[in-house]
């Protein structure tokens, strides 16, 4: 039953902008109600790390990923932008859970493929152009600290783009991307986070605190 009882007992508690009911989020993501509530505890920590307003700002997102809000990375920026569905410069709780759901081991592969396509579509045109592919490749290499010469990067990008752009029109559409990923599944390997399959084990302190809170409520009502 998790913390659902304790949450319902606090109907008057202030909720941040974009807060969505855990039961609703559980119905549209691979997470259970209890796991959504555990993610809310994580969300509260992230959203108050710099600005305590119940929203995750890009600097807070950078801090969570790199422990350094001043370190810029195109890949991290793109993840933030795709999480920010409303495109208002912040990540709300509902957006946080729904987007994380794509990284769940049980999430459908087509959702992971679609999410990855959005990451590479830097200019949000509905297509991935060669320069966008190169920018993302460079960002990923930088993040992995793998050093390649400019010539090697060009060869890598050219080979990938030719393979993906089957229509030879200078851009990769979503259908071409799906085919490309099916031939190169490693492209979405990082789209799965195993620990999301068992949030309760990932955040044991939260689970234990919830159980204690429920026991207290039962004692009060008995």
From Swiss-Prot:
Principal subcellular localisation of the protein: membrane
Keyword terms: Cell membrane, Cytoplasm, Lipoprotein, Manganese, Membrane, Myristate, Nucleus, Phosphoprotein, Repeat
Disruption phenotype annotation: Delayed development and flowering.
Necessary cofactors: Ca(2+)
GO cellular component term of the entry, any: calcineurin complex
SUPFAM superfamilies, per database record: EF-hand
Top-level lineage group: Eukaryota
PROSITE patterns, alphabetized: EF_HAND_2
Domain EF-hand: 35-70, 71-106, 108-143, 152-187
Task performed by this protein: Acts as a calcium sensor involved in the regulatory pathway for the control of intracellular Na(+) and K(+) homeostasis and salt tolerance. Binding of a CBL protein to the regulatory NAF domain of a CIPK serine-threonine protein kinase lead to the activation of the kinase in a calcium-dependent manner. Operates in synergy with CIPK24/SOS2 to activate the plasma membrane Na(+)/H(+) antiporter SOS1. Involved in salt stress responses by mediating calcium-dependent microfilament reorganization.
Protein name as catalogued: Calcineurin B-like protein 4
Source organism of this protein record: Arabidopsis thaliana
Gene: CBL4
């Amino acid at each position: 039953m998790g913390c659902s009882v304790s949450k319902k007992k606090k109907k008057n508690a202030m909720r941040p902008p974009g807060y969505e009911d855990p039961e609703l989020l559980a119905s549209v993501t691979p997470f259970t109600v209890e796991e959504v509530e555990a993610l809310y505890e994580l969300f509260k920590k992230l959203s108050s790390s710099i600005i305590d307003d119940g929203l995750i700002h890009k600097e807070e997102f950078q801090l969570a990923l790199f422990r350094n809000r001043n370190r810029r990375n195109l890949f991290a920026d793109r993840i933030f932008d795709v999480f920010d569905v409303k495109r208002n410069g912040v990540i709300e709780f509902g957006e946080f859970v729904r987007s994380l759901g794509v990284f769940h081991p049980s999430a459908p592969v087509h959702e992971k493929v679609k999410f990855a396509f959005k990451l590479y579509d830097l200019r949000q045109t509905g297509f991935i152009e060669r320069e966008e592919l190169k920018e993302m490749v460079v960002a990923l290499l930088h993040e992995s600290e793998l050093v390649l010469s400019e010539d090697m990067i060009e060869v890598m990008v050219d080979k990938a783009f030719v393979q993906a752009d089957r229509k030879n029109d200078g851009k990769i559409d979503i259908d071409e991307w799906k085919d490309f990923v099916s031939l190169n599944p490693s492209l979405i390997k990082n789209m799965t986070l195993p620990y999301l399959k068992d949030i309760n084990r990932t955040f044991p302190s939260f689970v234990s605190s919830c159980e204690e809170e429920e026991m207290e409520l039962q004692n009060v009502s008995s």
